[in-house]
Amino acid sequence: VGFFGCILSFIIYKCGTDWIDVVLPPAAMGPVVALIGLELSGSAADNAGLLADKVDPRNVIVFAVTLGVAIFGNILFRGFLSVIPILIAVIAGYVAALACGILDFSQVASASWFALPNFQMPKFDMGAIMMILPVLLVITSEHIGHQVVTSKIVGRDLLKKPGLHRSLFGDNFSTMISGLIGSVPTTTYGENIGVMAVTRVYSVRVIAGAAFLSIICSFVGKLSMLIQTIPGPVIGGISFLLYGMIGASGIRILVDSQVDYGLSRNLTLTSVVFVTGLSGIAVKFGDIELTGMVLACIVGMILSLVFYILDRLKLTNDREEA
């Protein structure tokens, strides 16, 4: 699947990215990007243990401490501290979790200092490849959405420089390498986009350095187990803010693009995309299920293309209103 993704990136390299403005205009792209954050908001609350039938008060305390430090740190911190509000919030939440007695260090004590990751030998299965291949469309849609919101955060059009074809190739080539060593496929993550929005650190070198340190840490068994002791309420508290910022970035696309909602097609497009993503509707094709942001993105692309054709044929009533 990663190989086919690399082929797709080559096709995009030859065809360019102008088609994105046709199939995903701002009236569709804005809500799609917003849905990336809004769709994940439920998982943030679930990680924090706030959706359980009986909510543990300790989880609420740890969640509130973490989220509070993240919010006010992002607003009040200056200088070097303004770069690491997320890290400080995690530490504050961890201390609160320790005080509340919800940490378990038993696995840290039993873990070895040096531990190799559990690699598996790859197995070539054409049936499995064909079953997962349709997911490539889903991954590509999500990748485009993530690139757009990242572009808004860093203030540079990443779809043009370095280019969608390069980022998509890197995404799929890394999936190939990951598969060859028996690991899981790689993909872009909204959480990391949220971290960039909060810290305002966009350096490729910093991100590459963090990736290198993560690889080194994976060989230190006790450190890996210590990281796993970070409780759900801490992760949920951080994610609550990060996912919200991604959602706000989608709204920012609509504002910056000055989308005219006096035009029927823009109002209809945004409305349908939002409701499709938030309604919980799911469409199944065999073992593949499309729902949430992915389904909304596909619906938005189809509608945008239809509206574009109708507009070119001068059949829309927006021309009369203009």
Name each model-derived stretch.
Residues 57-66, 84-85, 100, 117-148, ...:
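Hydrophobic, membrane-embedded alpha-helices of multi-pass small-molecule transporters
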Residues 1-104, 211, 216-318:
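Membrane-embedded alpha-helical modules
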